[in-house]
């Protein structure tokens, strides 16, 4: 059973209705896993608002998915801020993750906006010293109490 190897599952849901997504989230949680959803740059938070109470994480894409090394879309931080506000107003428990174009400068913007989980593929794997880059990111996270 592959499920025993995972503690979470990310849903990317093009052209599906939220009741169907909620069914998938329920199945994921019944397997003892955490459920997350990815939000592409063109997708407004309003489209997933009715799912937020059930999610463990929301991933805000700051690039178009599928291609590494793209430029960080800073305007997507408005979604992060909106998710923080909704989480606080409704006592939701989800983490806010950012993926795409994250580097030593943009990671600060992510944390300052309210993200608490980061994906930084190209910035880490493309670094001359991967260990030093990871340590740099860890230090920045500490500065933001993450």
Region spans (language model):
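Acidic, divalent-metal-coordinating active-site segment for phosphoryl/phosphodiester hydrolysis
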Residues: 101-113
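C-terminal helical cap(s) of enzyme catalytic domains, especially alpha/beta-barrels
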Residues: 111, 125-146
């Amino acid at each position: 059973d592959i499920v025993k190897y995972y503690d979470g599952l990310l849903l990317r849901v093009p052209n599906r209705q939220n009741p169907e997504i909620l069914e998938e989230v329920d199945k994921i949680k019944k397997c003892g896993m955490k459920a997350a959803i990815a939000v592409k740059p063109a997708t407004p938070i309003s489209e997933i608002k009715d799912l937020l109470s059930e999610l463990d994480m929301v991933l805000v894409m700051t690039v178009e998915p599928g291609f590494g090394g793209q430029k960080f879309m800073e305007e997507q931080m408005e979604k992060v801020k909106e998710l923080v506000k909704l989480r606080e107003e409704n006592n939701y428990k989800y983490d806010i993750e950012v993926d795409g174009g994250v580097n030593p400068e943009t990671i600060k913007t992510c944390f300052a906006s309210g993200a608490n989980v980061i994906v930084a593929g190209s910035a880490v794997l493309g670094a001359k010293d991967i260990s030093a880059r990871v340590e740099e990111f860890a230090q920045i996270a500490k500065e933001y109490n993450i």
